[in-house]
Amino acid sequence: MQSSERFSEPSVPASKRRLGDDDPLMPPASLLSKFNARLLNPAEAATLPGQRIRPSVYIADRLLVRPNGHYPRSRDLLGQAAAGRGLRLVEELPPRDGDAPSIRGAVMRLEPDDFRPAQVDAWWVIQDARALAGREEPLVGVGLDHLMFATPVVANPYNSPNPYNSPNPYNSPNPFGGWSPIAQYAEPGGGGTQPVNIVLPKPVRQDPMCGRRPVIAVIDTVVLDHPWLREGILTGVTLPGGEIIGFPEFMPAPDGDGVGPLDGLLDPFAFHATFISGLIRQVTPDADILPVPVVRPDGVIIESELLHVLDQVYRLAALHSTGNAGPAIDVVSMSMGYYHESPADVAFDSVMYEALLKLGELGVAVVASAGNDATVRPMFPAAFTPHAGGPVTQPPPNAVPIVGVGALNPNGTVAMFSNSGPSASAWAPGAAMVSTMPITFNAGLNPTSAMIDPSGQRRESPHLDDFSGGFGVGSGTSYAAPVFAAKVANELLTQAQSSGGIPEHESVEHAVTRGRHAVGALVKW
């Protein structure tokens, strides 16, 4: 394929996009500098003939390269391009050697060569490498290391990175002008985070089970303590050699101020995976949950770190599929995403799609949130769900397809904040959800009024960040995705009833068939 052919159908210019295909506001400079990230601005970025790009955010000094037969050539072209800009290309993380199954690509780092000043910009190096590759044999499997963000509705998106984890309209009326119907989802009483009382009993798990339990890997933050989550949470899981799963060091502060300004507020994503796990427990109490921490307490995920944990999940699933010890993995729940600079071209250079496809080829159903920017612009990985005109147009023949999930209001209508279009092939409740919160959380907010009454009892107005009661409210496609993932697990259990339950070990072909049937029962492609 010629490089001119690759860009022969450029993305539609802004003036001709369909209604709702808007670019969300980009993160502020303070967030970019924290992660050595750059904003790709279409008005300023270098482009090739016929190429149109859209805003995105990426790590300035890193590149991702797919682990395939093109790797040596891609590495050499990138090295030449880097040298032309006074930079040196370093293999920060080379492709995994040996026969062990892996989906991890290479992470390449750029740094100034010798003692010369140089501007480090991965986008320029990729574009130069594409030009060096020429029209006859274009550069394949090379991409930016994007900055990604988790996707609930939070009231302070600039404390966490607006707009990817929650767009600006959630906490202020901009850009809609005046009062915003979207902003209310972040307010207490409208679906925003606040403590609540519940009188429901703890979900009951069958014991013993007929067959093994389905396992849902929650790729998110650290799961924290709650009475509902003290069984069926697979902690201490390691890979051969003792390799720890995920980044458990991304631990939030229970009393606030772990990240962001010194304002005493809870880290905006401190409770994220705990809330998600509670939703899964409510929908499918018989499933086990494997926490895979990769989201920082401020909601930021670096794509290369996500690929690292996806590789760990893949290796766990592959080990189990060959009869080795360790947990099976049936479903992956991902409440995060990013906007690709060239959405029509993303499957061509995406290391992430290759990783998610390989999981699907093991029979793992990958479920991703559609995003909260009230746009039809594709958010990835949710937009890898099969759809006409997208990077994946049909369900892959030998894999479980990826599902992107949008959020519904309590009355079944689409939540005003939810992305739709290419990112949403399925829908699930995601607004004004009630779930588990870490019981240790009590940060800097205080009741607006408090007193000791004549009987000696303490009286208070609502204490909006005291979650010692263990439950809270939240909104976002972040919460629709795990609800749908739990429904997939339930479908796996239902379909296995006639055959004595989910088998402890099975062929990959059987696992793929089970996964496709479970997803197919819930999504009509």
Regions found by a protein language model. Name each.
Residues 323-337, 398-402, 493-525:
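C-terminal subdomain of the subtilisin-like protease fold in secreted/lumenal serine endopeptidases
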Residues 145, 293, 333-337, 367-370, ...:
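A cross-family glycoside hydrolase active-site/sugar-binding cleft signature
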